[in-house]
Amino acid sequence: MYLTLIILPLLGSIVSGFFGRKVGVKGAHLITCVSVITTTFLAILAFFEVGFNNIPVTINVARWVDVESLYVLWNFRFDSLTVSMFITVLIVSSLVHIYSISYMSHDPHNQRFFSYLSLFTFMMIILVTGNNYLIMFVGWEGVGVCSYLLVNFWFTRIAANQSSLSALLTNREGDTLLTVGMFAILWSFGNIDYSTVFALAPYYNENIITIIGICLLIGATAKSSQVGLHIWLPQAMEGPTPVSALIHAATMVTAGVYLLMRSSPLIEYSSTVLVLCLWLGAITTVFSSLIGLFQQDIKKVIAYSTMSQLGMMVIAVGLSSYNLALFHLVNHAFYKALLFLGAGSVIHAVADNQDFRKYGGLREFLPLTYSVMLIASLSLVAVPFMTGFYSKDFILESAYGQYYLSSTIVYFVATIGAMFTTLYSAKVLYLTFLTNPNGPLVNYKHAHEGDLFMTIPLIILAIFSIFFGYLTKDIFIGLGTGFFTDNSLFIHPSHEIMLDTEFAVPTFFKLLPFVFTVSLSLLSVLLSEFLPKLLINFKFSRLGYNIFSFFNQRFYIELFYNKYIVEGVLKLGGQTSKNLNKGPVKLLGPYGLEKGGLALSNSLGNLSTGIVTTYALYILIGLIFDISLLYFSYNDNNLLILIIFTLFALLNSNKK
């Protein structure tokens, strides 16, 4: 069953990609969807068998690397962390496959699209099941390549080309440091197998663990779009909307957080890495929330919302609450996929326009889409008893419950981020569905809900967004849960804060995020409805214009990168190519070898004079040289060099 679970998406991808012309569009739909849905049911069985029974399964497939002391097996491990990620990845992936049947129905390259989707799913499965860092890295690079292929699916669009390259190159920065971290693990521990590394981690110097942890954190920063290496995420919205739902909800962006959770037995022994995670997540949460508030593209707003929630997960990792980070990751996948697919339904209905300032009044035309996006938004802002409430608010409470200065500051910073998350969620809903119509009349004439293939995934995800958090909270974060007793997640006893979070945090600080978010949402709606002139006048004032430009242009970070980093790197590359590659390297390399070979062949050709006595002299010199070589190899080497030099001088004089 477990090998079938891994192989099925790959088989679907191969059939759809290589035999698409034979099976046709409907055949590609059927094969890829059946393979992924079957894999999903197998994953649910694995969740109950492995997770609830605490019976990790390891499958050894083949020997991969066997060089001196390095021995790497191609093997897969199924534990509670793996099967929890399966639930997220495969349920969302199967629903995205079904949704794409209708959404991509008019595209001429359906087989290629579904092949990429299934390949993406397969690579994510490899990433979460790998039993060592090397196999994990295969899946890590695989999802990066598939992301490039999917974002650049409409390859005739310049914006898609640029966005896919941005995603690929930005992730290479993190991948480079992750590779350095893997080499550091290999150098320190002598192996890259999870069980070996994690068993030895307590006995190693904290400085070594810190260096390795920072390398892993930078790798996760790129993949999970944290501040500094985040610029690829909003640009990746150029791909089809189902791709956005798959990449930014359940697969690629969660890979970085998964890496940190999987490495919990390692980074738990470095307080520096945990503090870095804490602050990185807090800064990312506020940073992305502020930018998202000033965007006008509906998909980019949701993308920055994803970035904000990933920051929350990294905060949970910094608090050593890995089970809480996993719980939020799983919850977030469902309501974020619902937001993206709901946005896709809106875009599909209004002739592919993504600027929500040109929507308005769509509640009457898209009642189902409005309902599911309302549910997803309520879950995103952690309204009580929705799925997001059980994990997001618990992360904020845990930050306060650690009772350190840094975690208390992070609590207030993350609360501010949650407030702005509520604001832009209300903004999207209000301007898309509730305000007066602002778009062209022709869009409203043709606006309609999608067919069954588009509506069924929305309804299923809406159910998950309401009930999943309540039904599974005791499994993931309950005080008596035994779900993680297989040691897939490790929390050092001195870092355990779950009891303090549950019972010691004052009620005021538990309610503060909810009160702030509701108050700010009501204030924003009141200002928009009853005092719109005040907002408009402020926006067109000099101060308002500067504030809007600063946040709308994403803190000018991309401008800074392009002007000072990219330009400098390109100049350095140009000078290196001009002065080094085309200079000494070329002289010593191809050009020098060519000229040297020609000169040598000409010199040897000049020795052929056609005179018998000259050839007799060559034979005599060769004989003397051989005898001298044997004799002087046991005596003075300097004399041997002198004789060789004399022979060459005689040859040259004879040639002249």
Curated annotation (Swiss-Prot):
EC annotation? 7.1.1.2
Q: Name one GO molecular function term.
A: NADH dehydrogenase (ubiquinone) activity
- Leader sequence residues: none
Q: Does the keyword Membrane apply?
A: yes
Main site of residence? Answer: mitochondrion
Keyword Signal appears in the UniProt entry: no
Protein location? Mitochondrion inner membrane
- Record's keyword terms, sorted: Electron transport, Membrane, Mitochondrion, Mitochondrion inner membrane, NAD, Respiratory chain, Translocase, Transmembrane, Transmembrane helix, Transport, Ubiquinone
At the top of the EC hierarchy, this enzyme's class is: translocase
Q: Which domain of life is it from?
A: Eukaryota
**Pfam families registered for this protein in UniProt:** NADH5_C, Proton_antipo_M, Proton_antipo_N
Any one GO CC term of this protein is: mitochondrial inner membrane
Q: How does it sit in the membrane?
A: Multi-pass membrane protein
Purpose = Core subunit of the mitochondrial membrane respiratory chain NADH dehydrogenase (Complex I) that is believed to belong to the minimal assembly required for catalysis. Complex I functions in the transfer of electrons from NADH to the respiratory chain. The immediate electron acceptor for the enzyme is believed to be ubiquinone.
Protein name as catalogued = NADH-ubiquinone oxidoreductase chain 5
Q: Where does this protein come from, organism-wise? A: Aspergillus niger
Show the taxonomic lineage.
Eukaryota, Fungi, Dikarya, Ascomycota, Pezizomycotina
